[in-house]
Design a protein with these regions (language model features):
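Short, flexible loop/turn elements at secondary-structure junctions
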Residues: 44, 82, 121, 151-153
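An exposed tryptophan-centered "aromatic clamp" motif
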Residues: 54, 59-75, 81-133
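Extracellular adhesion/carbohydrate-recognition regions
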Residues: 1-71, 75-76, 146, 150, ...
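Generic detector of ordered secondary-structure context
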Residues: 29-32, 109, 141
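Disulfide-stabilized extracellular recognition modules
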Residues: 126-164
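Surface-exposed, flexible loop/turn segments at secondary-structure boundaries
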Residues: 48, 84, 155
Length: 165
């Protein structure tokens, strides 16, 4: 999606703004999904560190992001399935590590790993989400993967005046 292109008389493309964007960059490291009100790290752990991680290392990675207060936040975590699946969009072809096509918005930089660890505790098999196929898979917790940390934005309260008596 993004911007549509219209043709004018001289066949020069003219960009037409479609209005507010769903994904908004909030500084150099953070993206806000305005549809779900979830903040995401722009880069996954593979892009950030250049190495794969098992599930336990993915949890440690999110803990380190909290210690460093990336984006000014200290509540980064592994995403839940219902959160991560909202990033999948077949209309986007974003080249991932090794040239694998990932179906995520181009606001996320190219080169991410195709699977990301998810929150979940099911014995020794842990959930991952595959951005090339749009599905959740369960694998051994010591398998290779990456993580794209997230956090939920707090609900904004509308300021109201106290009632007069």
């Amino acid at each position: 999606m993004g911007e549509e292109v219209q043709q004018v008389k001289n066949d020069a493309p003219v960009k037409v703004d479609e209005g507010p964007k769903r994904f908004v960059e909030k500084g150099p490291h953070v993206v806000l999904d305005t549809k779900t009100n979830v903040f995401w790290l722009k880069k996954d752990s593979w892009q950030d560190k250049g190495k794969f991680s098992n599930w336990h290392e993915a949890v440690e990675y999110s803990d380190r992001k909290n210690l460093r207060q990336i984006g000014g936040f200290d509540d980064w975590r592994l995403p839940f399935f219902d959160e991560i699946k909202t990033l999948y969009d077949e209309s986007h072809d974003n080249p991932g590590k090794g040239g694998v096509i990932l179906h995520v918005d181009p606001v996320f930089p190219e080169g991410a790993f195709k699977v990301t660890w998810l929150a979940g505790d099911t014995s020794t098999r842990r959930p991952r989400y595959d951005f090339s196929e749009g599905k959740e898979v369960y694998v051994d917790e010591y398998s290779f993967g990456a993580v794209r940390c997230c956090r939920k934005a707090p609900v904004q309260k509308v300021a109201t005046r106290p009632k007069r008596k």
